[in-house]
């Protein structure tokens, strides 16, 4: 393990040399950002090759958390037959994800006070417990269902770290011209894990045959249960490997900071919340992120339920969900790399992405109402509209994260992103709560997509961007 910046107190102390400051006449935000500069210490700016290993381990953890969270939605028909799950159970299994964000602020405090290593180890340990709980062999179906729900709750508690810590990791380990890319990779891998659940589940677990005779149905139920347990054991093994790797090597931070922003002093936990809640610009852009991304996350979790009324099979629904998220991950990383090369364009990128998201979500919603709109309802149109929607929305996540941090700097990255992901999961949880009661007819859920995307587009248009952290790295360090 690399040597750390030795103590908690030292972590919050200035590390930059004297004489660094903004030119006379700089804007007020530039002066506020520069006020957090240290008074003495070595000049930072070194990056280490091990940063990619740290990013890989964190990304694999995020991938596994997304995979475990989305285990049940893509195989909901099979789970109903194997374990006697109801539509309420399936919605609740997905709902444990946003419920796991309720102690989000405790994880933000831990990340701010104890750093990456302690927080990541606790997160991975919770995932080991959760996936292990689902694998306990019991014959009582009622007890098995409780164990599965308990495992999903523990995995949901890992969500705050994998969703919030990406900008913190990128600032801690990466230089200014790599931060957006690192944030995109770390944050997108959780979505990619959820996408792989759409692929792995339906391919490994067979769909039930509702027309089979009674004896054949019992045999099919046992076979489906065995295949589901195979998936559960495989996920448990993957999580254990990742936990072992992070336990063996996951340094809290590099010996020297990679940039001026990484070395600068940050606001305290209490002052950070006061700054966030009093910043109207931050609240505006936070809602622009939380509402559509929360709606889309909940919609993706029950995509199979939504597509069943239009006669889309479990396997086809899985492929649609898979490619929509994979496309968003690829485009998101590409957009972040573009943002690293051409700085100060985050708002424009978001406007383009949400214009596309509004159009594609409207197309999908109207297509599902083909009896009224007479639009062609084919596999091609469903694939195209869902994939485009996933590409536009998922690829906006790392761009939003970078804009949040720039807007409220010097608030710590973990606290900033923790607040917005908490809001996103709150909206997701509210929608999934309604799904547990109104799961027989979900056309209303489809209309939430274009409405939330349009609202977000209007909020982004009214938002006035600023780049306080970038000012430190590009101007002050010159």
From Swiss-Prot:
Residues carrying sugar: 209
Cellular compartment(s): Lysosome membrane
BP terms from Gene Ontology: pyridoxine transport
Catalytic activity: pyridoxine(out) + n H(+)(out) = pyridoxine(in) + n H(+)(in)
Modified how: Cleaved in lysosomes by cathepsin L between Leu-214 and Ala-261, generating a N-glycosylated N-terminal and a non-glycosylated C-terminal fragment.
Signal peptide positions on this chain: none
Cellular component terms per the entry's GO annotation: lysosomal membrane
Region (Disordered), start-end ranges: 1-27
Record keywords: Glycoprotein, Lysosome, Membrane, Transmembrane, Transmembrane helix, Transport
Keyword Glycoprotein: yes
Chain ranges on the Lumenal side, renumbered to this chain: 73-89, 139-152, 206-229, 303-314, 369-384, 436-442
Entry's transmembrane regions: 52-72, 90-110, 118-138, 153-173, 185-205, 230-250, 282-302, 315-335, 348-368, 385-405, 415-435, 443-463
Chain location of the short sequence motif Di-leucine motif per the record: 15-16
Stretches assigned to the Cytoplasmic side: 1-51, 111-117, 174-184, 251-281, 336-347, 406-414, 464-478
Keyword Metal-binding: no
Membrane topology value: Multi-pass membrane protein
Function: Mediates H(+)-dependent pyridoxine transport.
Similarity field: Belongs to the major facilitator superfamily.
Entries under PANTHER family matching the protein: MAJOR FACILITATOR SUPERFAMILY PROTEIN-RELATED (PTHR10924), SOLUTE CARRIER FAMILY 49 MEMBER 4 (PTHR10924:SF27)
Protein name, per record: Solute carrier family 49 member 4
Recorded name of the encoding gene: Slc49a4
